[in-house]
């Protein structure tokens, strides 16, 4: 019951936080541009077919669809998916499923040019299964774009880092994200998994994804954006040891 209440409250607040929030909009545009460049490099026809594995209220899905791509959003939290569906315009090239990709198969596996995971691994109780799902959803040679926190989004340290890098105005602006995120994390509880670049690259390799590049991004570099390619594997990644994942904390 507490989890449902927290999710419903988060759904009501989330869009107000991200809509018109320049750092987040810049981040999503960067992800979209990266997908388009990778697809062009592979000489694949436009538009791209994209899966967002934990789409939340669908803000990323809608922005990608607005650029002309065909996008599927999946999320295990029903109130978030319901809000995403209500916000979706008729005729839009996107759709939403209330499923947990760690346990339920995404429609049309091995058909997506790109899979997007936005801040999923640090909170999901089974991150290894999420990475396996990303690989299964991709066409051969398709790309996984994984964004995850490399350190906690602590209000004071992150705002201070933004101030030092970008000035007072940007630091004050960052509070729009940091304060609601801190409140949500306090209400949600549970373990967290923060992955430095080398650790994330290792996990991607272990689950059939070849890292191609990585950048520290978003609010003073608290997040790691890594892009990778689906590897052909003679051994199914699902058979690999999931115990190699570091403990969430």
Regions found by a protein language model. Give the residues of each.
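A short glycine-rich, Lys/Arg-flanked "PGG" loop and its adjoining helix->strand segment in the class I
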Residues: 128-140
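Short alpha-helix
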Residues: 191-207
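A short acidic, Gly/Pro-enriched loop at the edge of an enzyme's catalytic core
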Residues: 106-115
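A short SAM/SAH-binding and catalytic strip from SAM-dependent methyltransferases
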Residues: 114-126
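Core SAM-dependent methyltransferase catalytic element
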Residues: 207-209, 215-242, 246-249
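Class I SAM-dependent methyltransferase SAM/SAH-binding core
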Residues: 51, 57-103
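Conserved class I S-adenosyl-L-methionine
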Residues: 1-45, 59, 145-173, 180-184, 218
């Amino acid at each position: 019951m507490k989890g449902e209440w927290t999710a419903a409250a988060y759904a009501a607040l989330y869009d107000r936080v991200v809509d018109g929030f320049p750092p987040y909009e810049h981040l999503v545009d960067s992800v979209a541009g990266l997908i388009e460049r990778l697809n062009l490099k592979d000489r694949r026809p436009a538009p791209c077919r994209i899966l967002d594995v934990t789409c939340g209220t669908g803000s990323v899905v809608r922005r990608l669809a607005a650029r002309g791509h065909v996008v599927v959003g999946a999320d295990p939290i029903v109130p978030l998916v319901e809000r995403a569906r209500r916000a979706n315009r008729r005729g839009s090239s996107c759709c939403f499923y209330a499923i947990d990709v760690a346990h339920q198969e995404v429609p049309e596996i091995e058909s997506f040019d790109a899979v997007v995971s936005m801040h999923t691994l640090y909170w999901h109780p089974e991150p290894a299964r999420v990475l396996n799902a990303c690989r299964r959803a991709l066409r051969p040679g398709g790309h996984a774009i994984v964004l995850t926190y490399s350190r906690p989004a602590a209000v004071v340290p992150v705002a201070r880092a933004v101030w030092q890098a970008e000035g007072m105005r940007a630091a004050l602006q960052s509070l729009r994200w940091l304060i609601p995120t801190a409140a949500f994390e306090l209400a949600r509880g549970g373990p967290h998994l923060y992955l430095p670049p080398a650790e994330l690259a290792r996990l991607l390799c272990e689950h059939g994804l070849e890292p191609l590049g990585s950048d520290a991004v978003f609010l003073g570099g608290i997040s790691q954006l890594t892009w990778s390619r689906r590897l052909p594997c003679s051994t199914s990644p699902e058979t690999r040891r999931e115990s190699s994942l570091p403990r969430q904390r």
